[in-house]
Amino acid sequence: MTSSSPILKQTPKFLSALEGQSHANPPVWFMRQAGRYLPEYRAVRATAPDFISFCFDPEKAAEVTLQPMRRFPFDASIVFADILLIPGALGQKVWFEAGEGPKLGDMPSVESMAEKAGEAGKALSLVGETLTRVRSALDPDKALIGFAGAPWTVATYMIEKGSSDRSGARTFAYQNPETLDALIQVLVDATIDYLAMQVDAGAQALKLFESWAEGLSEPLFDRLVTQPHIRIIEGLRARGVTVPIIGFPRGAGTLVEDYAARTPVQGVALDTSASAKLGQTIQKTKTIQGALDPLLLRAGGDALLKRVDEMLEQWNQGPYIFNLGHGILPDTPIAHVEAVLERVTGQKVGQ
């Protein structure tokens, strides 16, 4: 297996930040930067019959991945896909309903899913085709990020069949610990294979999205978040994958510091609640990423630019990647994105 994508003449700023370097103007990208706030995205999305088909169309997915790179001076591009592709690869039906979000069918037995976990990369090879298309079109100084939903977060959707109420999954964790641990391990194995495929296809960095880390007790957080992340990273390294990895335990609060200390990630993405001190503490050993509130980005005005300045002042003395604390909202004005990017890059952006 290829341990990393082809060597480029210039190390992208995003990757150098993950190596621990600081920059006068930090690298910047936004979660969900390819999305509905862009009219060009909406135009392409309208040509796909449904969201899953959209994710599995390499031509369309590559196009929307590249759209924000053409419009804005982002330093990294993240492949357009979804965290719920892995359940489909394991045999659970996944679909999206307009205005309601993801829906999942009955979860197959853990035993049947375990048989498919080692073939997740093959089952999701169309995402690899998207990555290859994007990498060939990206400027050499721009980095390409692959990603996956982390096991606990994916498991919550699989257990609750798409419900946004995590209480059912937490209750399942208490009542069925052995079954949940087995499911988490299946997802660890599938995620390793899926992410290794993404690196082979051109991803230069990886991100684990633990979107539902909030509300877990310290013992549950260790069992369902920290330990599975460690196993994924160790599994990738054992397969020769050397690219940097960012972990995003969203909503974990003070447990993020322990997560950063114990997991072998190179970067830790912070959510909007992260304090200046928390970020500075983690920066002593890791690169941090984040953590502008998407609601503030949408609101705009003086408060937005003031917060951008605060974040740069408190975190840009160490290795730092400017980003949001969650995905960009669909009704975010493009002018607000441009204003933030002007402030971060020090360059004129937009018209």
UniProtKB/Swiss-Prot annotation:
The keyword Secreted does not apply. It is found in: Cytoplasm. Pfam families: URO-D. GO terms for biological process: protoporphyrinogen IX biosynthetic process from glutamate. Its EC number is 4.1.1.37. Pathway: Porphyrin-containing compound metabolism; protoporphyrin-IX biosynthesis; coproporphyrinogen-III from 5-aminolevulinate: step 4/4. The keyword Nucleus does not apply. Keywords: Cytoplasm, Decarboxylase, Lyase, Porphyrin biosynthesis. The record marks 82 as: Transition state stabilizer. Substrate binds at residues 32-36, 51, 82, 157, 211, 326. GO terms for molecular function: uroporphyrinogen decarboxylase activity. It is an enzyme of class 4 (lyase). CDD domains: URO-D (cd00717). It comes from the Bacteria. It catalyses: uroporphyrinogen III + 4 H(+) = coproporphyrinogen III + 4 CO2. Homodimer. Catalyzes the decarboxylation of four acetate groups of uroporphyrinogen III to yield coproporphyrinogen III. Belongs to the uroporphyrinogen decarboxylase family. This is Uroporphyrinogen decarboxylase. The gene is hemE.
